Amino acid sequence: MAAVRKPVLLGLRDTAVKGCPKGPSAWTSSKLGGVPDALPAVTTPGPQCGRCAQPLTLVVQVYCPLDGSPFHRLLYVFACARPGCGNSQTRSWKVFRSQCLQVPEKETWNAQNQSDSLAAENWCEGSQDWGSDTEETPPPPASDLGSDSNDVRALDWTEKLQALRLQDTALAVTCPSPSGEGLTVPTAVPQFQPYYICVAEEEDYGSVVDLDHAHSLLQEYQRREGVDMEQLLSLGSSDGDEKYEKTTVSSGDPTFYRFMKRIAACQEQILRYSWSGEPLFLSCPTFEVSEVPACSGCGGQRTFEFQLMPALVSMLSSANLGLAVEFGTILVYTCKQSCWPPNQQMPMEEFCVLQEDPDEFLFK
């Protein structure tokens, strides 16, 4: 019996982050660029490049609490944006996971208002106040992302991920963390302009997409390589769960063809999220994918969680400071148990795999 494909959420770029957001409204948001936001009592990561030993730059921050878990949960992806480092495999890429226990909203309100005699209607008006000192609509209460139930539509992540975009400018600033919000690493690192991430369900694009552009790209690929991709694909078996078998062919790449065909529905996607699902490979998977190391914290198995997509590359360029990050796709694997020891104050390092873009010009 064919396995059921797990739902996929797509991350898309949206509005710019203004100023230095503080409090839960900052760390319950997902974004591209800027500086990492700290969870309460947990330090922000400050990784260094394994090649040049310089501080890494934040690429994305993803707020993704798991279904049924009592923890807030943040994932950070860092890369070296200096020339020659950003495409030097995973030595220049790092992934970290931070968590902290959620405090029920009602308990928080009661603790802060023990001596107050506010009317019930006032409590209702303020019950969604997350402590932001801006007038923006606060994000909804934390919910869950990634569970065995796969009830993706109910996930708060689809509402919290608000947008992502990078201009051809970069910053070299560090926003101070408000007292008590988290432990920060005061390092001035070149930063990409921060943007929020918004989310859509991949299946929503299936019936409305115009495939003309994708078809023209594939025709060009077939002409240049002198191959018939449909014929190549027929050489491999297909059991419905997208296992992406390795097919030995004289030329052409059926895995790349599948990748192009799948993303044609939403070419602007910069992130694909599918907890414990199947990654969308850009090229035939290497031993790194089949031999993902165990979690360094609990020794348990890691599982695929999300990947960064080629459309993100052009958003991470900077003409001013010469910063650039190049990749085809970045596959992120995290602890399947999402372990977090009591009183843990340091982020847990996770694992990522870099696949280079075999035909970079196709994504321009």
UniProtKB/Swiss-Prot annotation:
Record-linked InterPro entries: PDCD2-like_regulator (IPR052815), PDCD2_C (IPR007320)
| Gene3D superfamilies according to UniProt | YwqG-like
> For the region Disordered, what residue ranges are annotated?
125-150
Q: Keywords for this entry?
A: Acetylation, Cell cycle
Entry superkingdom: Eukaryota
Key word Signal present: no
**Keyword Nuclease annotated:** no
Q: Which residues carry this modification: N-acetylalanine?
A: A2
| Example of a GO cellular component annotation carried by this entry | cytoplasm
What does the UniProt function comment say about this protein? Over-expression suppresses AP1, CREB, NFAT, and NF-kB transcriptional activation, and delays cell cycle progression at S phase.
Q: What protein name is recorded for this chain?
A: Programmed cell death protein 2-like
Which species does this protein come from?
Mus musculus (Mouse)
Question: Quick one: which gene encodes this?
Answer: Pdcd2l
